[in-house]
């Protein structure tokens, strides 16, 4: 049974999990990642590895600066109706209301 999954992640470490969920046939209803950051000598805006891969997979991407304070983004994500959230190295603390939203809960993959 394919699940509707909301994926949260930022660095390259999180990309294989996103790809595996996508390959398994689950419906990724959204990908939440950190906003583009300025890096390098030219201070160019560089997207996260997860954002880059999500766009290649034609998945909807959300980049809240601070999810705890962005109530509009929280509502948009709730409206996606995900069955499950999968979090892998997102980089922000998720508010309780976000954690409680999916009926099947949230799964956190941690590298430590």
Task: Give the residues covered by each predicted segment.
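One-carbon transfer enzymes
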Residues: 1-112
């Amino acid at each position: 049974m394919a699940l509707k999954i909301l994926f949260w992640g930022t660095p390259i470490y999180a990309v294989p999990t996103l790809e595996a969920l996508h390959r398994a046939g689950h419906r990724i209803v959204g990908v939440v990642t950190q906003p583009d950051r300025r890096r390098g000598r030219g201070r160019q805006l560089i997207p996260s590895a997860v954002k880059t891969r999500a766009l290649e997979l034609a998945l909807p991407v959300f980049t809240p600066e601070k999810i705890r304070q962005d109530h509009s983004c929280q509502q948009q994500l709730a409206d996606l109706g995900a069955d499950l959230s999968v979090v892998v190295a997102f980089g922000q603390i998720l508010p309780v209301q976000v954690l409680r939203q999916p009926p099947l809960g949230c799964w956190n993959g941690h590298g430590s």
